[in-house]
Amino acid sequence: MNARSRALLLLLLVAASAAVLPFLRYLTDDTFIHLQFAKHLVQGKGFSFNAGEPTYGATSPLWVLLLAMTGKLLPISVAAPSDPASMPALAWAAKGYGLLFHLVAILALVLLGKRLGWDDRTALGLGVLLAAQAWTLRWALSGMETPLAVACVALALYGFAGVLVRDRPGWGTGIALGLASLARPECTLLAAIVVVTVWMGAERRPRRALEVLAGLGAALLPWLATAWTWFHTLLPNTAAAKAGATLEPGPFVAALHAVFQVELAADALPLALFVLVLAFGNRSNALPVARGRRFFWFACVAWPALLALSFALEGVQVVSRYLLPATPCVLLLGMASFRWVVATNLPNRYGAALALFLAAFVVQNALFTALVSAPSTIAHTSGLRSSLVSIGIWARDRTAPNASFAVADIGAFGYYSERHVLDLYGLVTPVLAPITVREGYNAVVTRALYEVAGRPDYLIDRHPREGRLAQDQDQPSPYRFLFARRIPNLGITRPGGFYYSVYAIDWRVMDQTRQRVASALPGGPQRRIL
C-alpha cells in the first residue's frame, strides 16, 4: 500500500470506531453469562456459573479466559455494582476488547484483499463493507465474544489465502482456526473445510495440510484436555441448550427462514451480486485458473452455506450473531462478484461502480441500524436493567444466601443476585436441556419438570402475561406471585413485550396437588406425574 492508501486505512479504522458508538451501552443477558464465569474464575470459584460447580456452560471459553485474565491483572472490580444503571467494570473491559477485535477484523480483511491481488481501493472497499455491516456494528460493543470470533476467522482466511495462493506455511492458519473454534464452537466446521481444501488445493498438499492441523491442535488441545479434566466432556452444554428438534421439518424451515432474514437485512447487495455470477457466469470466465485460488473460493462458498445448513438440521433458534463468523466470506464473495460483474459489463467504469456499490451498501446498513437495530438495543438494554438486573439485586438483598431460583434467562440475574440458579433451558443445568427441547418451556414451568434438577425456592417465569401461573387456578397454586418486571423486547426477532414474574414456590402445595391429580387417574394414587 502507498502512503495515501495507508492514510485512508487509518481513516477507515477511525470511522469504524465512531460507527459503533450508538451501541456503547448495549448489553444482553448472555453478556452476563460470560461475566459470571469470568468473575468466578477470578474469585477462585472455578469455571462455573454457580460458584464452585464447574460446568461447560460458556459457549466461548476463550472469551471467558480473556475476561478472567483481565479481571485478575487489572485493578478493576469483577463483582456486580449495586446500582442497576451502572455498567460493570468487567463489561467495559469486554466492550474494549470488542472494539479492538472489530478493528483487527477490518484490518485483516483489507490485507486479505491485497493478498488476493486486488488493488488498494478494492481492498479498502472490502474493509468498508465489514465496518458498515449492520450486524457487525450491533455486536461489536455488546460484550459478547462475536468480534473475537470474526477477527479470528478473518485472520484464518488471510493465512488460508497465503497457503493456497502463495504457498505459505499453514501453522498460523491452524492457530487462528483453533482460536476461532474456542471463540465460537461452530468454527470447527470452518477448520474442517480449510483442512480439506488445503489437502486438495495447495501446491504441497500433505505438508501444508499437516501444518494447518498442527497449528489447530496447538490451539485446541490444551483447552480440550482442560475441559475433559474439569467437566468430563469436550462439547459445551450450549450444543443441546440452543438446539431444537433435530431433523424435524418445522425447526428446519424456521432456522432457514431466520438465516435468510438476517442475511438479507445486511448483506442483500453482496448476495445479489453473487447470485448474478451463479446465474450468468461459467467455469471459463468466473473461476480463476489457478487451482489454489479455485479452492479458496470454494471454501468461501462452503463455509456460510454449511453453517446455515447445520443450524437448520439441528433446529437452532438462529440469531444474527451466530452467523457473523461467516460474514467475512459473504463479503469476500460479494466483492469478488462485484469485480466480475463490472469487468464483464463496465470495464472502464470500475472506480465509479465501486463507489456506487459501497455507498449503496453503507446506506442500506446505516438505515437498518438507525431505524431498527439501534433503537431495539436501547430499548432492550433499558428493559434488561429494569427487569432481570433489578430482580437480581432484589434477590441479593432480600432473600436468604442459600436460596435457589429456577430461571429462564440466567445471565444478568445470576451475575447480580449471587444466588444459586437452576437454568430452565439447561445451559448450566444440562439435565434440563433435553427435557426443555422435548417438552417445551411452558410444560417445564407449568408441570414443574425442572424438579429433576432440584427443588428451587423461587421461580422467575418469562411470559407475555404477568403473573400467569397464579391466575385462573381451580385449585390452590404452588406458585405465590410476588411481583413482575417488564422488558420491551428480547431482540429484533422477538419484539413483543415480556414479563419476568417472580414466584415463591410452595412445594407442600405442589405435592398435594399432584396427589389429588394422581388419585383421579385410572389406577389410583400410585400413579405420580410431574
Where are these regions (language model features)?
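Membrane-interface alpha helices of multi-pass inner-membrane proteins
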Residues: 16-20, 126-131, 154, 170-184, ...
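Signature aromatic-anchored transmembrane alpha helix within multi-pass, membrane-resident enzymes
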Residues: 6-14, 121-128, 192, 213-221, ...
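Transmembrane alpha-helices of multi-pass, membrane-embedded glycan-processing enzymes
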Residues: 59, 63, 67-74, 85-88, ...
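Transmembrane-helix signature of polytopic, membrane-embedded enzymes
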Residues: 3-7, 78-89, 104-132, 150-151, ...
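Membrane-embedded, lumen/periplasm-facing catalytic core of multi-pass transferases
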Residues: 357-414, 420-464, 479-530
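Hydrophobic/aromatic-rich transmembrane helices and adjacent perimembrane loops
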Residues: 140, 183-185, 189, 267-270, ...
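Specific aromatic-rich, kink-prone transmembrane helix
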Residues: 108-111, 128-129, 148-165, 172-177, ...
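Membrane-lumen/periplasm interface segments of specific transmembrane helices
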Residues: 23, 27, 33, 37-39, ...
